[in-house]
UniProtKB/Swiss-Prot annotation:
It comes from Salmonella dublin (strain CT_02021853). It comes from the Bacteria. Keywords: Carbohydrate metabolism, Cytoplasm, Isomerase, Rhamnose metabolism. Signal peptide: none annotated. Pathway: Carbohydrate metabolism; L-rhamnose metabolism. This is L-rhamnose mutarotase. GO terms for cellular component: cytoplasm. InterPro entries: Dimeric_a/b-barrel (IPR011008), L-rhamnose_mutarotase (IPR013448), Rham/fucose_mutarotase (IPR008000).
């Protein structure tokens, strides 16, 4: 398994809405994530800084990257665009984090 972590932002006035939209996520999005090898996906909110910290374990970079081209992912990004900063293609603006420590 490959462990990934990344950070995104959420609009200051959208914390509750962001959480509401994720609980639960669309069943078809959950199915796509799982079928593309995503496991143990979690997102945490830093309310003071409007930051989202996400972790996920993936089976391969190729399968993880393929999620972005699915119809359901494209619809999800469009659905979330009003609650978080996004790129021109509607994907959330994010930065991948480098792992510096792991205790198993």
């Amino acid at each position: 398994m490959i462990r990934k972590a990344f950070v995104m932002q959420v609009n200051a006035d959208a914390h509750e809405e962001y959480q509401r939209r994720h609980n639960p996520i669309w069943p078809e999005l959950e199915a796509v994530l799982k079928s593309h090898g995503a496991h143990h996906y979690a997102i945490y909110l830093d309310q003071e800084r409007n930051l989202l910290f996400a972790t996920v374990e993936i089976e391969s970079e190729e399968r993880w990257n393929a999620v972005a081209s699915t119809d359901v992912c494209q619809r999800w990004w469009k659905h979330m665009r009003d609650v978080m900063p996004a790129n021109p293609d509607n994907s959330p603006i994010s930065a991948e984090l480098k792992e510096v420590f792991y205790l198993q």
